[in-house]
């Protein structure tokens, strides 16, 4: 009788693949090193001065941007952690205003076919305007860079919220409306028991799109005119043009993506908690 011995590496690899707790992480473990290796090779071809590789980015930004992300030397000389917090404060104000206004307006348009049809061309035109196109006129109106940046967030984020809220109301099944008529539900009971539960998934779909657009808008707006913020940090590093500027920009871009992903997941998580469909 012969016994086939498997190499230890093969055993470990098989255990990794079959382990239900580790298997979901396998694509990341495989793909991330490949991505970093390709990035390092491209960097070597183009030159570290043009595109720093991952090793150089970490080495050039380790102190203070990675180790001390919340340092504050006064003025706009702050760590990336503080710069992100400045941007998040602006996003929070603009996004919350857009959410409240968008849900209210979308609810009115969804319940009134006349207003919904009449204002649809206006909404479709305005929602296609790029965020930065609003910045000059907001500066002329508000005469303040911070308020203008918040307005850009608001005007960028509001449209998907309005549209999805209105669509959600229009998609309420006819059976639900027929039951409401048969039971002679009051307006209040109809809104609480039929309209809101049926519309919540659509509203959060709009909120999820809106938070991504809001984060994109603030980064771009801060590059044009702002005192602090992650967008300001990126543009300031570009204008500085020092040896570590490229590494600082790449690190900031990584943080921008990480925060954007976190905001998206946060809104999606809240939506799953609130939505009756997910229960």
From Swiss-Prot:
Part of the ABC transporter complex NrtABCD involved in nitrate uptake. The complex is probably also involved in nitrite transport. Probably responsible for the translocation of the substrate across the membrane. Keywords: Cell inner membrane, Cell membrane, Ion transport, Membrane, Nitrate assimilation, Transmembrane, Transmembrane helix, Transport. NCBIfam families: ntrB (TIGR01183). It is found in: Cell inner membrane. One of its GO terms (biological process) is monoatomic ion transport. Pfam families: BPD_transp_1. One of its GO terms (cellular component) is plasma membrane. This is Nitrate import permease protein NrtB. InterPro entries: MetI-like (IPR000515), MetI-like_sf (IPR035906), NtrB (IPR005889). The complex is composed of two ATP-binding proteins (NrtC and NrtD), two transmembrane proteins (NrtB) and a solute-binding protein (NrtA). It is a multi-pass membrane protein. Residues 84-267 form the ABC transmembrane type-1 domain. Belongs to the binding-protein-dependent transport system permease family. CysTW subfamily. The chain crosses the membrane at residues 25-45, 91-111, 149-169, 200-220, 249-269. Disruption phenotype: Mutant is unable to grow on nitrate, but grows normally with nitrite or ammonium as the nitrogen source. GO terms for molecular function: nitrate transmembrane transporter activity. It comes from the Bacteria.
């Amino acid at each position: 009788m012969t016994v086939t011995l498997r190499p230890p590496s093969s055993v470990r690899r098989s255990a990794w693949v079959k382990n239900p707790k580790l298997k979901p992480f396998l694509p990341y473990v495989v793909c991330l090193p490949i991505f970093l290796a390709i990035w390092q090779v491209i960097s070597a071809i183009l030159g570290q001065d043009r595109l720093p590789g991952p090793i150089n980015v970490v080495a050039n930004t380790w102190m203070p941007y990675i180790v001390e992300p919340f340092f504050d030397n006064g003025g706009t000389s702050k760590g990336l952690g503080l710069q992100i917090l400045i941007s998040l404060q602006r996003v929070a104000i603009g996004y919350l205003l857009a959410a409240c206004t968008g849900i209210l307006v979308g609810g009115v348009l969804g319940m009134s076919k006349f207003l919904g049809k009449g204002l649809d061309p206006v909404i479709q035109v305005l929602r296609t305007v790029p965020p930065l196109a609003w910045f000059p006129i907001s500066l002329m109106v508000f005469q303040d860079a911070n308020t203008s940046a918040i307005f850009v967030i608001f005007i960028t984020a509001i449209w998907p919220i309005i549209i999805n809220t209105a669509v959600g109301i229009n998609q309420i099944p006819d059976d639900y409306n027929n039951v409401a008529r048969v039971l002679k539900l009051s307006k209040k009971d109809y809104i609480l028991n039929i309209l809101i539960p049926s519309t919540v998934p659509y509203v959060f779909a709009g909120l999820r799109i809106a938070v991504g657009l809001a984060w994109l808008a603030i980064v771009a707006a801060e590059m044009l005119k702002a005192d602090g913020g992650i967008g300001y940090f990126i543009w300031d590093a570009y204008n500085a043009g020092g040896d570590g500027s490229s590494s600082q920009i790449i690190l900031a871009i990584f943080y921008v993506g990480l925060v954007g992903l976190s905001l998206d997941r946060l809104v999606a998580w809240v939506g799953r908690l609130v939505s009756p469909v997910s229960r």
